[in-house]
Amino acid sequence: MSSTPITDRDTIQTWLDHPTGGPALRGFLERAGSDVDQLAPAYGLPLGKLVDLSGGKMSQEAIDAIVRDANGGEIPVAAEQSASATGHRFEGKTLIITGAANGIGRATARRAVAEGAKVIATDISGDGLASLAEELGSGQVITVTADLSDAAAVDEIVAAADGQIDGLANVAGIMDNFAAIHEVTDEVWARVFNVNVTGLMRLTRAVSARMLENGGGSIVNVASEAALRGSAAGTAYTASKHAVVGITKSMAVMYAQAGIRTNVTVPGAVATGIAVPKDVGEFGNERMTSYRPNIPAMTT
């Protein structure tokens, strides 16, 4: 056993460089018929994140076995790693957060609650929202299971805020199938735009009207690196995220004097659990393959 314990909170790169962790991880992958090269995009992530990223192919029990192998049969107690809140910026505020069941949306909800907010958490995953409410406490989280592609969902989400809406984080989004434009079907185009653009527009339309009545608020839209370049996804997703940036720019101008602050963030690869359809566009996916090694390592 190494004199320096290693846990599932350490990054995969740290594991590979560790005197006992490296052999333990490589040995596990070899027995599973895999190798470390397949983990290259995730080198910067904690080992434990592989449970979520693998879609169930790697269990927590398997991760624990690797940790024990690297630590002489024991699982060391990990140091507490939690981001400290910077205060109570959201005390008395009500925030709506879409895509709150996992990934960026869930992390946003955690931080908002930690800083005193009442959160209206919405997502299509009822199970994910239930676990979020259990984690954060039902007193500060109201969950609304809703599909943003359904126009009726907007009324339900806004009603849950009970009149006061101080902030909106438009995080929810879905991926396309990497299809180039000559491969894009009407179904894929409509599905991506209904959630990423039309759903965002409908909810923001309702929320901004409420904010105008109440004297202001703050809206943050989550786009993607696909809003900055054409080599991150297929045509439908890329176009949808460019649209999100366009909506944000328009709102920033329209409401600058009305007390509504609007911003957009364009994250790179993040372990969000966003599903990628299996029916990938052959031409587009082949083109994207050559660009993937240039994408910065995934983060959480």
Task: Walk through the language-model features, giving the residues of each.
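Canonical Rossmann dinucleotide-binding motif of NAD(H)/NADP(H)-dependent dehydrogenases/reductases
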Residues: A85-K118
